[in-house]
Design a protein with these regions (language model features):
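Short beta-strand-to-loop acidic/aromatic patch adjacent to the donor-nucleotide binding site
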Residues: 21-34
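Short, high-confidence coil segments that cap the C-terminus of an alpha-helix
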Residues: 21, 51-53, 151
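C-terminal catalytic/acceptor-binding lobe
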Residues: 128-184
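Alpha-helical elements of Rossmann-like donor-binding domains used by nucleotide-donor carbohydrate transfer enzymes
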Residues: 7, 11, 39-46, 141-145, ...
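Short catalytic/ligand-binding loop motif for oxyanion handling, primarily in non-cytosolic enzymes
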Residues: 33-35, 63-69, 162-169
Length: 184
């Protein structure tokens, strides 16, 4: 663990002895991959085919609007989002959020992120000083940085269950980091 998700990811990543092409996965602790292991590995390897792949994830958007909210409803209506995630509501019922088909995207949600060790080293995992919250907006920061470096972020086909809805109620740090991201 650490004092922030940035510190935790950086500390744990640095403990690994990875070759540049090894793939490292960062994910929430409340997800479950429902694909068979062989299907998951096949889809992950397929997503990394091609040159300059940055991050691969389960959900994201082709366009991050001025609000910096990747799941923006207006952009969703325009077909800008990608991915499919099963969630569990407060009553324990499973429902599916279908953002759109797998495609290349600008940014990805941090629910599930995969990247080669080389990409992770290029992007870096340290928290920038201008992000004040310790646990929020790392996903948009990392994946937008990869995009700005000329890498291609992708949503892959993955059957994934998220045991929460990603609730923001009472999470001022998410709103503060979002505003800091917009300002920088």
């Amino acid at each position: 663990g650490g004092d922030s998700i940035f510190e935790t990811y950086e500390t744990e990543f640095n403990k690994l002895e990875l070759k540049d092409t090894d793939v490292c996965i960062f994910c929430h602790d409340d997800i479950h991959i429902l694909d068979t292991p062989s299907a998951f590995v096949w889809n992950l390897k397929t997503a990394f085919m091609g040159e300059d792949v940055g991050f691969v994830g389960a959900a994201g958007t082709k366009y991050l609007g001025e609000t910096a909210i990747w799941w923006d409803m207006e952009l969703w209506k325009m077909g800008m989002h990608s991915g499919r995630v099963k969630h569990i509501d407060p009553e324990g019922k499973t429902y599916i959020t279908d953002y759109g088909p797998p495609m290349n995207v600008a940014v990805l949600d941090g629910l599930f992120l995969a990247a080669t060790a080389n990409t992770i080293r290029d992007v870096g995992l340290s928290k920038p000083d201008w992000l004040t919250g310790a646990w929020d907006f790392y996903d948009i920061y990392y994946t937008s940085k990869a995009l700005m470096q000329g890498k291609v972020n992708k949503v892959m086909k993955v059957d994934i269950l998220h045991r929460s809805r990603g609730e923001l109620v009472g999470r001022m740090s998410w709103h503060e980091n979002r505003q800091a991201f917009i300002n920088n």
